[in-house]
């Protein structure tokens, strides 16, 4: 089955190509599995935890989270900049399901580690599967959505806001 076909109603599409092995190597060099999220971009003087969770906790607007937290991730930071992402973070999802919600902006998703048969996103009434590949996915997360991991393994991906 080809999981990479674009949605017919633009809930998601492949928006770019990357060297996923390079990104994976960089991400795995800094990842800490004690966290569910690690910021890749924050505000000036922010750390890898300043910006996680609900934005209402922070005084800054989402678009101000644009300073790389890990300068050593040169290729990953270059991709984030090229795709005009902000408030980008590593998501580490254990077995479970996120709440049904809508975000204020669309999101870019770059899968790093996933079980394509047991991890999927639901946007409105459409199931979306994003395999680990060179593909980068734009997803209209302003629509109601959730993410599900039924695997016993963590799912790791990069997610970032775009306007």
Protein language model annotation of sequence segments:
Residues 108-111, 136-138, 152-163:
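A short hydrophobic beta-strand segment most commonly corresponding to one strand
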Residues 111-132:
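A short beta-strand-loop-beta hairpin characteristic of the jelly-roll/cupin
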Residues 1-80:
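Non-heme Fe(II)/2-oxoglutarate
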Residues 97, 118, 137, 142-148:
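Histidine-centered metal-chelating micro-motifs
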Residues 101-104, 123, 149-152:
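Short glycine/proline-enriched turns and hinge-like loops at secondary-structure junctions
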Residues 92-93, 102-118:
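Short, conserved beta-strand element in jelly-roll/cupin
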Residues 86, 104-106, 154:
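Residues that flank catalytic or metal-binding motifs in active/ligand-binding sites
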Residues 74-95:
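A short glycine-rich, His/Asp/Glu-containing loop-to-beta-strand
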